[in-house]
UniProtKB/Swiss-Prot annotation:
GO terms for molecular function: SH3 domain binding; zinc ion binding. Keywords: Coiled coil, Metal-binding, Nucleus, Zinc, Zinc-finger. SUPFAM superfamilies: FYVE/PHD zinc finger, RUN domain-like. One of its GO terms (cellular component) is nucleus. This is RUN and FYVE domain-containing protein 2. Residues 37-169 form the RUN domain. InterPro entries: FYVE_RUFY2 (IPR047333), RUFY1-3 (IPR047335), Run_dom (IPR004012), Run_dom_sf (IPR037213), RUN_RUFY2 (IPR047332), Znf_FYVE (IPR000306), Znf_FYVE-rel (IPR017455), Znf_FYVE_PHD (IPR011011). The gene is Rufy2.
Length: 606
């Protein structure tokens, strides 16, 4: 028969033992029904089996004194491969009782089981065979398939809850021997199951009572700590109350002083406001007087405009009369048949005069267009006059047309003159008379035209006067605008003065508060000086006994000065602290001074 490889037989035996130990641990833990501790036998045997599995095929490391095999090296490698394992490595290194690498490895296995991550950690090791080859031989269990099978079996241990105390155990000196009797069935085991059930129930009751005892002890300790904290807070509150009473007395004095200062400031502000009101009223009166003068100027200008409008209405009436006269001239021109040439000369002269009138009207119109918005009414009147002149020009054009008709009639008349020469001779005397009358009418028209020229000159002079009045009004309006600007500037200066006044009031209030604080500090210093002058600081040599309890001082019973009265007391009679006027911080005070100062603070309270 062929001999088997002894290393393969060792691996198979270790695999079978691992299966039996893991299976027995899971079954017993589930039947046990509670968390496992370090004294549980199946759990101890499981760790022994795992230790043998990890030691199989481990390379020996030569040291100076001995030749050791340790499993801590590959387990320490897990930290680099699995970052979550850093906590286990750090906690194992921090354990004080462990001195050997084997003890650290055993503690590492127990912590990994409690975390339920032993299978994950060992799986990382098995995958990295190149790194494991530094620690294990090629035929080791961790390098072969049996190691992967054991890692798969370890996943079932996640069902178990274990609470192991690693600090108290002696993991360095334990002997790892596998107890095969646990895995061999006997008749006695069947009878002992009932005993184990009873023992488990008793252990459960024991654990329950221990947990209750722990909870009660924790509650009692927490209550003691609360009582101590409440006593300390009570003493602090009493001291703070005394300090608060002193502060309240000081604040009441400050309040009285501030009220008096506030009343003085109110009186000053009222006086200042009355003065400012009088100034504002005077400014308003001056503004009203200036406004009345401007209103009077405006009314005068309106009156002048009304007078000019009446004058222009009179001129329009005269123009209407002249238009009627021109109509009469048209009727007279029909009768002027023979003296057409002379009448043409006169008409040419009249045309020149009309062109001059038109040029004058155009100049007036241009000047009126250059005038400002305040002369719109005058522009409208001039436009009306221009319309009337246009009507006159149209009438003259009609006269020209009629003259052309008269020329035609003249030609016809020349033909008829030859026939009716005798009749004309008879009528010539009458016509000469009429011509003389027409000449007189022409003279009258020339005089009327001269009158119109003079009237237009007067209108131009009136326009210049109105322009002067407008310039004067503009100058006055500019003065009014400048006065308004000065008034606004004065208002801004008034507001700035008010702001400066308010800022000065705030500064005075702050100075008042600071002065009050300095006065209070000076009073406290004076009281402290008075207290120091009245007190006598007792020397250490002069005191041999406590003034209150009259116990003798020794090395254990030290001397303490009271900062208020200057006497020397023991620690028990001077275990009090209060703020004094001489020192803002709390200082040591004897019992009698402490009671006296608290009574004084309570009497000073309102």
């Amino acid at each position: 028969m062929a001999t088997k490889d002894p290393t393969a037989v060792e691996r198979a035996n270790l695999l079978n033992m691992a299966k039996l130990s893991i299976k027995g641990l899971i079954e017993s833990a589930l039947s046990f029904g509670r968390t496992l501790d370090s004294d549980y036998p199946p759990l101890q045997q499981f760790f022994v089996v795992m230790e043998h599995c990890l030691k199989h095929g481990l390379k020996g490391r030569k040291s100076f004194l001995s030749y050791n095999k340790t499993i801590w090296g590959p387990l320490e490698l897990v930290e680099k491969l699995y970052p979550e394992a850093e906590e286990i490595g750090a906690s194992v290194r921090d354990l004080p009782g462990l001195k050997t690498p084997l003890g650290r490895a055993r503690a590492w296995l127990r912590l990994a089981l409690m975390q339920k991550k032993m299978a994950d950690y060992l799986r990382c090791l098995i995958i990295q065979r190149e790194l494991l080859s530094e620690f294990y031989e090629y035929h080791a269990l961790m390098m072969e398939e049996e190691g992967a099978v054991i890692v798969g079996l370890l996943v079932g241990l996640n069902v178990i809850d274990a609470n192991l105390c690693v600090k108290g155990e002696d993991l360095d000196s334990q002997v790892g021997v596998i107890d095969f009797s646990m895995y061999l069935k006997n008749e006695e085991e069947i009878g002992n199951k009932e005993r184990n059930v009873q023992i488990a129930a008793i252990l459960d009751q024991k654990n329950y009572v221990e947990e209750l005892n722990r909870q009660l002890n924790s509650t009692v300790s927490s209550l003691h700590s609360r009582v101590d904290s409440l006593e300390k807070s009570n003493t602090k509150l009493i001291e703070e109350l005394a300090i608060a009473k002193n502060n309240i007395i000081k604040l009441q004095e400050e309040n009285h002083q501030l009220r008096s200062e506030n009343e003085l400031i109110l009186m000053r502000t009222r006086q200042h406001l009355e003065v400012t009101k009088v100034d504002v009223e005077t400014e308003l009166q001056t503004y009203k007087h200036s406004r009345q003068g401007l209103d009077e100027m405006y009314n005068d200008a309106r009156r002048q405009l009304r007078d000019e409008s009446q004058l222009r209405q009179d001129v329009e009436n005269e123009l209407s009369v002249q238009v009627g006269m021109k109509h009469e001239m048209e009727l007279a021109m029909k009768l002027l048949e023979k003296d057409i040439h002379e009448k043409q000369d006169t008409l040419i002269g009249l045309r020149q005069q009309l062109e001059e009138v038109k040029a004058i009207n155009i100049e007036m119109y241009q000047r009126l267009q250059g005038s400002e918005d305040g002369l719109k009414e005058k522009n409208e009147i001039i436009a009306r006059l221009e319309e009337k002149t246009n009507k006159i020009t149209t009438a003259m054009r009609q006269l020209e047309q009629r003259l052309q008709q008269a020329e035609k009639a003249q030609k016809e008349a020349e033909a008829e003159d030859e026939k009716y020469a005798q009749e004309c001779l008879s009528q010539s005397d009458s016509l000469q008379r009429q011509i003389s009358q027409k000449e007189q009418q022409l003279v009258q028209l020339e005089t009327d035209l001269k009158i119109e020229k003079e009237w237009r000159q007067t209108l131009q002079e009136d326009l210049q006067k109105e322009k002067d009045v407008l310039s004067h009004l503009r100058h006055e309006t500019q003065k009014v605008i400048s006065l308004k600007k000065e008034f606004l500037n004065l208002q801004d200066e008034n507001q700035q003065l008010k702001r400066i006044y308010q800022e000065q009031e705030q500064a005075l209030q702050e100075l008042g508060s600071k002065l009050c604080e300095s006065k209070l500090k000076i009073d406290d210093i004076k009281e402290a000086n008075k207290a120091l002058q009245g007190l006598v600081w007792l020397k250490d040599k002069d005191a041999t006994h406590c003034k209150l309890c009259e116990k003798e001082f020794s090395l254990s019973k030290r001397k303490h000065h009271c900062r208020n009265c200057g006497e020397i007391f023991c620690n028990a009679c001077s275990d009090n602290e209060l703020p004094l006027p001489s020192s803002p911080k709390p200082v040591r005070v004897c019992d009698s001074c402490h009671a006296m100062l608290i009574q004084r603070c309570s009497s000073n309270m309102p």
